[in-house]
Amino acid sequence: MLKIGRNATILKNNFWFASVRFQSGGFSEKLAKGPSFADFLNMDKPLTADEAFELDRKVELPNGSIHKRLPSWLKTKVPLGTNFNRIKHDLRGSHLHTVCEEAKCPNIGECWGGKDKSRATATIMLMGDTCTRGCRFCSVKTSRRPGPLDPNEPENTAEAIKQWNLGYIVLTSVDRDDLTDLGANHIAKTIQKIKEKAPHILVEALTPDFSGRMDLVEIVAKSGLDVFAHNVETVEELTPFVRDRRATYRQSLSVLKHVKKTCPHLITKTSIMLGLGETDAEILTTLKDLLEHNVDVVTFGQYMRPTKRHLKVQEYVHPKKFEYWKEVAEKLGFLYVASGPLVRSSYKAGEYFMENLIKKRSGNPASMSV
């Protein structure tokens, strides 16, 4: 008699998810009808008017209710302001990319346009604007072999950030599975350059999983950053359907745990999207898994479908539910929790609490303000 292992159990659960949560067909049918890798390679093609306004029309939610328009809590103002325009201009001049723009983040105006520029937050996307992976929630362009790295990017990034005089910067990157070191040294060099030119700026790096290679994780963890972020994105049960198949839930947890083992002083952070069909029990399990792997900070945000090629929204989670998960996470013991429909992993990363937490851990309480 064959012994059924953990992988077989997960496989069984995955097929159950495909047949029960997506009533229109099984997992194989979903993959066949869903976006192919080629679709992700051609994401520059503009949407039609009907596709662009799809979510402003009648949407049937899992509970049977109908939303005729996008919920009011998901609408944002057109980004304006001096800071917003200045940062955008500098980015173009330095040939830099931001995940704020590439991922169509709804908070770009709020993060870039703050009246107090020391509280403004920009998220620079390193290693180009094209990823080697094709996650089914992400709007960043995809290619098996993106262009070569810009050797001047670390210097240009550091110089631009120095000129902005921000208090907090977030660095993220595309996945570069085509590179020997998967981009780890490029990220680390950028962090080191920033700290050389502007040592007062707090640096958060939202990193890939580096295919689970802990030697590469260590290169970034030891580069001088203040916050090491890596997103699990969703609950374990949904991971195979949401993320690229090379990214696994357990691998992401291992990355976060290894960072804390390597650099105990570093703050570790992750993000979870809601609205993909996850259950409360699965979210609670995820939070407990994160704590067991020594994660300090967690954020919750609403999944928004960027194009018709991506996963459909299963639920528009009400703001009160986000408040509920914030309270649950805080009671469980996370040091900081940001939770709301429009929250993204780098959303308001430079809030007072986060900055004070970092300064306290670095032994600089005199510079703290409340």
Curated annotation (Swiss-Prot):
Can you tell me where the transmembrane regions are? none
What top-level class of enzyme does the UniProt entry assign? transferase
Kindly indicate whether the keyword Mitochondrion belongs to this entry: yes
What EC number(s) does its UniProt record assign? 2.8.1.8
Q: Name one GO cellular component term.
A: mitochondrion
The reactions it catalyses are: [[Fe-S] cluster scaffold protein carrying a second [4Fe-4S](2+) cluster] + N(6)-octanoyl-L-lysyl-[protein] + 2 oxidized [2Fe-2S]-[ferredoxin] + 2 S-adenosyl-L-methionine + 4 H(+) = [[Fe-S] cluster scaffold protein] + N(6)-[(R)-dihydrolipoyl]-L-lysyl-[protein] + 4 Fe(3+) + 2 hydrogen sulfide + 2 5'-deoxyadenosine + 2 L-methionine + 2 reduced [2Fe-2S]-[ferredoxin]
Which metal ions or organic cofactors does this protein require, according to UniProt? [4Fe-4S] cluster
Localisation per UniProt entry: Mitochondrion
Which Gene3D superfamilies did the record assign? Aldolase class I
Q: How is the cofactor bound?
A: Binds 2 [4Fe-4S] clusters per subunit. One cluster is coordinated with 3 cysteines and an exchangeable S-adenosyl-L-methionine.
The segment(s) forming the Radical SAM core domain are: 116-335
What keywords sit in the KW lines? Answer: 4Fe-4S, Iron, Iron-sulfur, Metal-binding, Mitochondrion, S-adenosyl-L-methionine, Transferase
* Top-level taxon of origin: Eukaryota
GO biological process, alphabetically ordered: lipoate biosynthetic process; protein maturation
Q: Where does [4Fe-4S] cluster 2 bind?
A: 131, 135, 138
Instruction: Enumerate the SUPFAM superfamilies for this protein.
Output: Radical SAM enzymes
Q: Which HAMAP family match?
A: Lipoyl_synth (MF_00206)
Could you share any additional remarks the record makes about this protein?
This protein may be expected to contain an N-terminal transit peptide but none has been predicted.
The entry assigns this protein to a family as follows: Belongs to the radical SAM superfamily. Lipoyl synthase family.
Name of this chain's protein: Lipoyl synthase, mitochondrial
